[in-house]
Amino acid sequence: MTAIGIYGSAGRMGRAIADLIEIEGGRYAGGADASDDADALAVAADVLVDFSTASAVDAHLASALAARTPIVIGTTGLSPAQHLAIDAAAAHIAVLQTGNTSLGVTLLGILVREAAARLGSDWDIEIMEMHHRHKVDAPSGTALLLGEAAAAGRDTTLSAVRVDSRAGLTGARAEGTIGFASLRGGSVIGDHSVIFASEGERIELNHLGQDRSIFAKGAVKAAMWLAGKPAGRYRMGDVLGL
């Protein structure tokens, strides 16, 4: 039985994951938050799941690395330097980092990449996301994940074509860019729309998160899949065999 430890266990996602572990056939190895011993949890668990804060991820990754324990990182708002640290850690342990653990969003990312590859550059790509009023980062990790999928479909990088906001006299839209719009309000769990717009027609690919359990189920599935895997950086698509 896979023992799963949770960093950020007192948060919304941490609690939801803890409630599902035994239902999904795992064992809850315990949780750790800001004042708790991250090293001890890394030793006790077969695999770790991190849904804490971006500022805490470095310490949690170091604990996982020291204990040689695989880790699923679902925390969003990570910096480029943190992604480089994840790459370095993945040379020694199995790491799965994702902006969204929903199985539906994972499939959406594949559809977005395929659409971007098939449609010409005269199709503009815009990504719109909405979350609850308490979310602290924007665009969401999921929106960026979808943007990366679209950019990959066009054989480029998101950093080369990303436009985060428009205000005032911005001029005409530059061809090939990928735009983002972020909305915050109420208790929205997470809505994402990827819009492909051309002259005279528009395609919209949408995902609506209606229950936080979809992310918790995906996180537990990912953790149980990752346990025992060789060192490397994995993605949610690997969990689904996509």
Describe these PLM feature segments:
Residues 36-40, 56, 81-85:
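Short acidic active-site motifs
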Residues 62, 75-96, 106, 111-115:
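Rossmann-fold NAD(P)-binding glycine/threonine-rich loop
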Residues 3, 7, 12-45, 122-242:
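C-terminal substrate-binding/catalytic lobe of Rossmann-fold NAD(P)-dependent oxidoreductases
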Residues 34-36, 76-79, 100-101:
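Short, acidic/turn-prone active-site loops that include or flank metal/cofactor-
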Residues 7, 51-52, 74-75, 98, ...:
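Structural motif
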Residues 17, 60, 84-86, 115, ...:
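Aromatic/hydrophobic pocket-lining residues that form π-stacking "cages" and hydrophobic walls in ligand
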Residues 70, 85-102, 120-125:
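Rossmann-fold dehydrogenase core element
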Residues 48-66, 77-82:
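Beta-loop-alpha module in the N-terminal Rossmann-like domain of NAD(P)-dependent dehydrogenases
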